[in-house]
């Protein structure tokens, strides 16, 4: 298809049309009294949501020009969603309005360079004004208020999120998952940890809408080595495939033949697998892998110092967890094995002794980071309801409220 160049009044008209579509579809969801929107799906029931980002992504005008303009606005919402996790409705409305007003000014004969400079100056003025208004959110009541507003005025959601923040701390790990029960919202505190490493290939993703890897009851293979070839882990891959359970590989790196074979197995459906890099560097990586091994009940962290080889590992020697959640940036392990609590506490006590005996401020800081990850645990918000549509709508609001709360307490 040949490219079409559009300028002048035709372009301005298309911009106005897209802005009006966004105002009608997205603008109505804004604020604590915002309305919900039903999004038609090619299969299954429609999705009911108040999430501006989901609404924006669903807007696909048939006109190619209108679609291109809508995609530009959606990109700004996407960046806002990635960086903050909330505020996408406000971001989209502002972006659409800026584009509309710039189009009007240009049509009236204003110089486009002057318009751009004016927009940038206005942005700085607005940011300065907002920074002067900000204040810290400290109390549990204030946290609940922030979450309640973002959850469309649902006080129960606000109170539960504030409870989670108080339990695991403002830097603690809080996740949201669907419950099989009818109870609208429940909180469960469990062992677990999160580290700053994401999946090594987007092909590992199991939830394409949110670009997540989500595993239930997975096996976990830990190694300090770099995996370049598939041969050393073939026996364990075959055993895991026969078990029907997913596998998470945490290694120094996974690349080349090893990575491509894992991706191929995942795409063919032969094995639910994902791979991430181990957190930390050098000796700190060794220590953090040891922490993960204690938490998950893994008997070995495969390394050059260990007599046992990867080919000889059995399923009983691998780690396990209740759930694994992996984004492009983070890995969250939720729920330790049943008999690991005593071992985790022993590890925590060991780290505390190391902190007291260390003379290096840097080492103390890193030890405290490990202590926080291991002892903080994970708070799980379980969302239930009487129907799938109800659960998904409530889960969207809980996730939005959680993102808003995190942004407020940072």
UniProtKB/Swiss-Prot annotation:
GO terms for biological process: protein refolding. It comes from the Bacteria. Keywords: ATP-binding, Chaperone, Cytoplasm, Isomerase, Nucleotide-binding. It catalyses: ATP + H2O + a folded polypeptide = ADP + phosphate + an unfolded polypeptide. It is found in: Cytoplasm. It holds the Pfam family Cpn60_TCP1. The keyword Magnesium does not apply. Its EC number is 5.6.1.7. The keyword Isomerase applies. It is an enzyme of class 5 (isomerase). ATP binds at residues 29-32, 50, 86-90. SUPFAM superfamilies: GroEL apical domain-like, GroEL equatorial domain-like. Belongs to the chaperonin (HSP60) family. Forms a cylinder of 14 subunits composed of two heptameric rings stacked back-to-back. Interacts with the co-chaperonin GroES. This is Chaperonin GroEL. It comes from Ehrlichia canis.
